[in-house]
């Protein structure tokens, strides 16, 4: 079994399911004995990137900060899961080059479905003009051109998405077979306990 660190970079629109899937992967990998950290975009913005706005420059600065932390943890054999919209290709590509052991996971979901899942009411605020520069509404989201994994959360269950990610990590040499094919039946209960289902 390889215990080398790597970074899973979850990118996608707000409401696509990045945090939910990040928690699912975290739960599974911790159960297999891995050290795992999640860098959630919302949490990073309130701590590490407090004071940054949503201009292209500020968003890229936010991504560079997340990538810096991921790089440090990766070289110390930690699995990092960055769950951030990260709307611009150039910033994601910079993160890939900077970190090294990097797996881009595109959490694809139609904006109409993301709007339905909008528990924070952000799309509504953006539609009303109360939030400017909101990704997918009045600021672009540049889809990945060659992601390592594509997850379609409007078509797959959480369990299917988790298995898809784990199998791909095995194919890329980041996980051993025994880390992939563990029982995932406890996952749903854990996600319910965390309030994601």
List the model feature ranges, each with a label:
Residues 1-7:
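Extreme N-terminal, non-catalytic leader segments
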Residues 10:
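Hydrophobic anchor at the beta1->P-loop junction of P-loop NTPases
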Residues 14:
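The conserved Walker
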Residues 18:
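Conserved lysine of the Walker
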Residues 23-68:
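Conserved substrate/cofactor phosphate-moiety recognition/catalytic segment
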Residues 47-53, 58, 70-127, 133:
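ATP-dependent NMP and nucleoside kinases share a basic, alpha-helical "lid"
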Residues 108-111, 116-166, 172-177:
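Small-molecule kinase domains that catalyze NTP-dependent phosphoryl transfer to phosphate-bearing small molecules
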Residues 181-197:
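Catalytic domains that recognize anionic headgroups
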């Amino acid at each position: 079994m390889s215990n080398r660190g790597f970074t899973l970079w979850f990118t996608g629109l707000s409401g696509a399911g990045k945090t939910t899937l990040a928690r699912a992967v975290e739960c599974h990998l911790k159960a297999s004995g891995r050290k795992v950290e999640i860098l959630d975009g919302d949490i990073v913005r309130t701590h590490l990137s407090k004071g940054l706005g949503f201009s292209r420059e500020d968003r890229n600065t936010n991504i560079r900060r997340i990538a810096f932390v991921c790089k440090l943890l990766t070289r110390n054999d930690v699995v990092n899961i960055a769950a951030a919209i990260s709307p611009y290709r150039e910033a994601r590509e910079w993160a890939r080059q900077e970190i090294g052991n990097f797996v881009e996971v595109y959490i694809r979901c139609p904006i109409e479905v993301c709007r339905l899942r909008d528990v924070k009411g952000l799309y509504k605020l953006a539609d009303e003009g109360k939030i400017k520069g909101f990704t997918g509404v009045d600021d672009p989201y540049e889809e990945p051109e060659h992601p390592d994994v594509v997850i379609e959360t409007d078509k797959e269950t959480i369990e299917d998405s988790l298995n898809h990610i784990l199998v791909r990590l095995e194919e890329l040499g980041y996980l051993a077979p025994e880390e992939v094919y563990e029982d995932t039946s406890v996952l749903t209960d854990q996600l319910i306990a965390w309030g994601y289902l």
